[in-house]
Amino acid sequence: MVPSTFLRSKPARCLPVLLATLIFAGCGTHTQDQSAAFMQGTSQANSSFYLQQMQQSTNDSKTNWQLLAIRALLQEGKKQQAIDLFNQLPANLNSTQAREQSLLAVEVKLAQNDYQAARNLLAKIDPTNLEQPQQARYWQAQIDASQGKPSLTLLRALIAQQPLLSDAKQRQKNIDATWQALTSMPQDQANALVINADENILQGWLDLQRMWFDNRNDPTLLKAGVKDWQTRYPQNPGAKMLPTALVNMQNYKPASINKIALFLPLNGQASIFGRTIQQGFEAAKNGAPSVTGSAVPAQVAQAANVSGNDDVVSPSQAEISDLTATGSRADPVQAPTQDQAAPAAEPAAQAPATSTTPQTTASPATQPVTAPAAQPQPVVATAANPSAELKIYDTTTQPISQLLAQAQQDGATLVVGPLLKENVEEVIKSNTPLNVLALNQPEKVESRANLCYFALSPEDEARDAARHIHQQGKQTPLLLVPRGALGDRVVSAFADEWLKLGGASVLQQRFGSTAELRAGVNGGGGIALSGTPVSTLPSAQNSILGSADEMPVSSGGSVDAAYILATPEQIAYIKPMIAMRNGSQSNVTLYASSRSAQGTAGPDFRLEMEGLQYSEIPMLAGSNPSLMQQALSAVRNDYSLARLYAMGADAWSLANHFTQMRQTPGFELNGNTGDLTANQDCVINRKLSWLKYQQGKIVPAS
């Protein structure tokens, strides 16, 4: 009996040890399985949870939680914490962890806005080796690294990502992004694309793009083309779920312009601007000559060289937004003097300063409008419509809300204006049901289905300059701008656009008055082509022109472009001072806004400005010589007012194409103030003409 008792007691004594071993083994397995499930993307949590699990784990499990925490921190916008944790990853990773680490390395570079490094890392990853959730992230990283620049790489990434998305909103976002890439691609680039024979989905998208290129300015043909495309490519993701922009096109109805209400200031400080815009608007309504072709100059610069322009005063010395900045008149550019302004107002003297009298004043005799050639190009002409009823409402007489109510009661179908920024903001607050083409842009744009924004402003010109300079392959631009609010606005607009284009840091340097610049020339100081990064410079800088030591160049490299915002008098000092400090053979290309353009420029000035590129509205660059002559005659050769005259003419064209601008993606109008397109908020963008001083002449900039 003793042996029997011994045998029974031995298992009994071992049982607690075995149970404990099984329990702990089970716990360890559960933890490992849990981190693996999160790694595979089947579960999600926030960074706090992952960090806590990481602290409580060891070995591979701890590394898994660390990788998950990095991913969550990046998603939560905690960039620096994610980078620090990423740098603490162990060197020895298993294959699963190594794949996740390689993807996180890309996402870290994207968080740092180091897009080139991200693209280099992506090139080393084979997406077929990734798990499906990782593949979706890989393709999103490819999309982000492209920075929205239309390319075959971007299109392929979007197409590859689409089937990996399960959420309907994400799929629609993907379809819309694909369409945005297609419609923002220049037609020459699209025509040069070469794809593989088995890329059926991409082929379908490119066929839709070609149809859109051919019919984008004809809503009826565009709608029919979309339906035909859906029939021919029924399995294309875009046919099953149309891009939002094309869905909106299915409901296209042209806006009526039988009764137009023109909201302008006809009294007070801005009246000269309001009356000049009115003149241009009425001239176009009654058949003024239309612009011929796009803003890209061919021989258009010749108009700027003719001797008949020798008595033209310097252009663009009075920007609209300088005068109409909300709640402030800080640093305004001087308006034309009374003897200059009066003649411009005389032709508009018939216009009543009340809000109730229809305007039927005919414009001066003009050439008939030339119809555009029948080709899939931007609209270049808008037919005259003298029978359209036009009423002028003086925005200085009543609150905007009352004028809008009066216009609606008068039967207006479209409002053009107001001009002042504060009045535009009042329109937004009013929630009017009328279609409104505002002639300025508020600080914060609100997207409304019945509202578009059309402004001539230094900011608008700065954005175009950023695009032009980036297109010329420049990497490190310096902004030479005046102290004060005007300089702040231009710097902000340029830098924002530069970042969108994928550029690195932008440098800036401020200067003072013309008298201070003159003193600098007399002192032999010169201007160093260096500056402080935009993100770190205070909004108001006290020094006139800092030394090279005071203005450190960013780590991105030496300056290769300088954009100058100055009057003709100021740039006459600035350019020689740049040469004085840097030598005339500097490799830095100089650019200027139209504010610097000199209608009275003689041979000496043109030689002094050798190599300088500057922007100009197409009308004053020579794209519409007849209207240019008419406008300059009306405003006594004041170029700044001639710009507003051109703006008025373009406002008429935009009014006639209001619905297309609002609803048709990629719709483009060749205007007197630029090639006009609208973004998704219906902010009208202008592509300007770029000219250059060369051997004493003005020629198109390459």
From Swiss-Prot:
One of its GO terms (molecular function) is hydrolase activity, hydrolyzing O-glycosyl compounds. The keyword Lipoprotein applies. It comes from the Bacteria. GO terms for biological process: peptidoglycan biosynthetic process; regulation of cell shape. It is a lipid-anchor. It is found in: Cell outer membrane. A lipid is attached at C27 (S-diacylglycerol cysteine). InterPro entries: LpoA (IPR007443), Lytic_TGlycosylase_superhlx_U (IPR008939), Peripla_BP_I (IPR028082), TPR-like_helical_dom_sf (IPR011990). Residues 330-378 have a biased composition (Low complexity). Residues 1-26 form the signal peptide. Regulator of peptidoglycan synthesis that is essential for the function of penicillin-binding protein 1A (PBP1a). Interacts with PBP1a. HAMAP family: LpoA. This is Penicillin-binding protein activator LpoA. It comes from Klebsiella pneumoniae subsp. pneumoniae (strain ATCC 700721 / MGH 78578).
